């Protein structure tokens, strides 16, 4: 039998059995593409090619793959030769029909560990691509253990294998499967409220939503992150399918008996909450696994707002057979199962550190930690797995009970910037990679040298639900403080809720910043807090905490949400205010960063300053101000606001203004 005959026979068998398979093609780039083209020519199908520079249609970049979720393809090629976008790879696997091949193009097998991966630029905070040895070794181990996955290496013998026959698969007929039928019955009888259907990919949740719409007595509006992702839902809903984009729906005032939200976890929480409040009955569907944000985390974070929530889960695959080899290898490679989250750890707690090398030496340990973090955090994705395995500057602590993970803490090194770079960040001229809190302390704070201090930021912390409220989280933070004795502080950035803040307060953190707009992902304002460890860290924490107290009333008015600290009634312009105001007027500091000191400046100035007063005192939008002042756009408006701030400062004290300009990065030559 020729190679083509063997390939076609194996593909026919896969179609009859309702399964999909992964073929890894590893070698030089040209050789990999030649093999992929030959297989593509031998098998009819869609053959979606996912690559930064795919040579054939239909094609898609990894970044654009999100727009195709909810669609189906027969066969696909994923080119990871330059870099492995794990989330896009997982998402692509979920779009493939039964009987499909997924071809994964990879560099020469022996170079995987040492070869720089361009995808690392998205998650490593490095200026250049870095090798990713832990992920490469993990992928090799996973592939070597799976006889259902094929590996074709350049200059190595390869033949198409034969596999024992499986039970013949009966594809879905379009009628509800038993699991779906039971949920449909419950939904039809549901009183007003919110229902969720969560499932791994391929379980028919979009089909279920469409079947429900086609059979319901009332009316329904469908919304989703992208209309292109609702093809399956639309096919089952038929002529009763009525789609509106989330923002258009919110603006329209449209009404219906039901709102159906497909892939709800991918819609920003504040927007979703507003939509949900408008309809008597809501059906939310979302994926339980991590490449779109975890469905389990979606339930934890968003659905906790609805105590009478009706929860449904689909477990049996509909679009392919159980034990599909492609689904199994993707789940194993990207750790989509959550065994550590599902099993309760009992016994005394012991806390210890582990390092990235553990992925190669004792992989069960970091795997269990990742499973716990993934189950507890709604935004954990394969990108976090890549970062956990190979990004520099990561630190990990685990709390175990009888060899089971009960809690975990993940910290990231930050700060240590040069004085020159820190000052440039403060002035708004530079934004180097990474250093989330350290940069924010400089860019949004009062100290130009804040980013020179060295800290460790809490990236993730989780305690198993069965062991919460025992102080395990506080023990992890206390242990982290001891391990970071050479640092100036620990830091954390989080979506503010009173409950979360109480936890960080109990750990010893001091609130130093509140954002001025809600996070799209959580619907909360961003809060930043420091736990000082050195004298310099204490001075910085005290200084920024005091600044926040001075600005508290203004931020409360701006945000419409109280800040949890005692406000200071100090309206006089102090040295920090003057320095920051000059940074706004003559450098690139953002307007909303300088809310407090600009408000105080307006109180002291008798000048009209219409662009500043209109934005800060009247809260007019940029568009309104541009129309009112006959300005061409936001850039011109900001330039005018900077010029008006400069005018007010010079009028108050020209000499002081000039002295501060003279010592500013760039000499204050970048006046707006």
Outline where the language-model segments fall.
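Conserved RecA-like ASCE P-loop NTPase motor core of nucleic-acid helicases/translocases
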Residues: 20-28, 39-41, 45-52, 196-198, ...
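Conserved lysine of the Walker
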Residues: 32-33, 205
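Conserved beta-hairpin
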Residues: 393-412, 419
């Amino acid at each position: 039998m020729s190679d083509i005959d063997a390939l076609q026979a194996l593909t026919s068998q896969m179609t009859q059995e309702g399964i999909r398979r992964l073929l890894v093609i590893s070698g030089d780039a040209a050789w990999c593409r030649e093999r992929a083209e030959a297989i593509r020519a031998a098998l009819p199908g869609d053959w979606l090619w996912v690559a930064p520079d795919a040579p054939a249609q239909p094609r898609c970049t990894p970044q654009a793959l999100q727009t195709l979720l909810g669609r189906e393809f027969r066969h696909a090629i994923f080119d990871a030769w330059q870099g492995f976008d794990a989330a896009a790879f997982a998402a692509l696997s979920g779009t493939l029909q039964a009987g499909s091949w997924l071809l994964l193009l990879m560099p020469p097998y022996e170079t995987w560990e040492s070869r720089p991966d361009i995808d690392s630029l998205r998650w490593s905070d490095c200026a250049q691509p870095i090798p990713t040895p832990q992920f490469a070794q993990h992928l090799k181990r996973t592939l070597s253990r799976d006889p259902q996955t094929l590996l074709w290496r350049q200059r190595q013998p390869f033949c198409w294998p034969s596999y024992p026959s499986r039970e013949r698969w009966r594809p879905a007929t379009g009628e509800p499967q038993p699991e779906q039928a039971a949920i449909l019955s419950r939904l039809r009888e549901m009183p007003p409220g919110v229902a969720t259907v969560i499932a791994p990919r391929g379980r028919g949740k979009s089909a279920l939503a469409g079947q429900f719409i086609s059979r319901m007595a009332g009316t329904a509006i469908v919304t989703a992150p992208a209309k292109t992702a609702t093809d399956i839902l639309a096919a089952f809903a038929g002529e009763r399918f009525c789609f509106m984009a989330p923002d258009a729906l919110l603006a329209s005032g449209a009404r219906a008996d039901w709102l159906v939200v497909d892939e709800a976890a991918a819609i920003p929480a504040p927007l979703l909450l507003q939509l949900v409040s408008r309809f008597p009955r809501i059906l939310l569907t979302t994926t339980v696994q991590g490449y779109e944000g975890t469905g389990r985390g979606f339930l934890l974070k968003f659905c906790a707002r609805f105590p009478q929530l009706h929860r449904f889960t689909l477990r049996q695959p509909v679009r392919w057979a159980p034990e599909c080899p492609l689904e199994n290898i993707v789940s194993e490679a990207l750790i989509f199962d959550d065994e550590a989250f599902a099993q309760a750890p009992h016994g005394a707690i012991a806390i210890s550190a582990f390092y990235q090398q553990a992925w190669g030496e004792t992989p069960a340990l970091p795997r269990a930690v990742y499973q716990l973090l993934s189950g507890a955090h709604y935004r954990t994705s394969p990108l976090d797995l890549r970062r956990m395995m190979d990004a520099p500057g990561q630190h990990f602590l685990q709390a175990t009970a009888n060899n089971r993970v009960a809690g975990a803490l993940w910290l990231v090194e930050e700060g240590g910037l040069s004085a020159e770079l820190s000052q440039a960040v403060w002035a708004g001229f530079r934004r180097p990679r990474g250093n989330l809190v350290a940069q924010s302390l400089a860019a949004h704070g009062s100290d130009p040298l804040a980013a020179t201090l060295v800290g460790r930021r809490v990236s993730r912390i989780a305690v198993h639900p069965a062991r919460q409220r025992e102080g395990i989280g506080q023990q992890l933070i206390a242990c982290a403080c001891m391990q970071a004795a050479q640092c100036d502080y620990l830091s954390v950035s989080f979506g503010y809720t009173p409950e979360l803040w109480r936890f960080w307060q109990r750990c010893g953190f001091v609130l130093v910043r509140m954002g001025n707009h809600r996070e799209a992902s959580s619907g909360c304002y961003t809060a930043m807090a420091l736990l000082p460890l050195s004298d310099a860290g204490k001075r910085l924490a005290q200084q920024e905490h005091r600044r926040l107290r001075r600005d508290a009333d203004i931020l409360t008015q701006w945000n419409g949400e109280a800040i949890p600290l005692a406000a200071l009634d100090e309206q006089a312009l102090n040295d920090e205010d003057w320095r920051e105001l000059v940074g706004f007027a003559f450098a690139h500091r953002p307007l909303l960063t300088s809310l407090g000191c600009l408000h105080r400046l307006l109180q002291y100035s008798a000048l009209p300053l219409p662009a500043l007063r209109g934005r800060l005192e009247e809260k007019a939008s940029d568009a309104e101000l541009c129309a009112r002042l006959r300005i061409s756009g936001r850039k011109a408006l900001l330039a005018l606001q900077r010029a008006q701030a400069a005018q007010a400062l010079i009028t108050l004290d020209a000499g002081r203004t000039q002295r501060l300009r003279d010592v500013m990065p760039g000499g204050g030559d970048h006046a707006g």
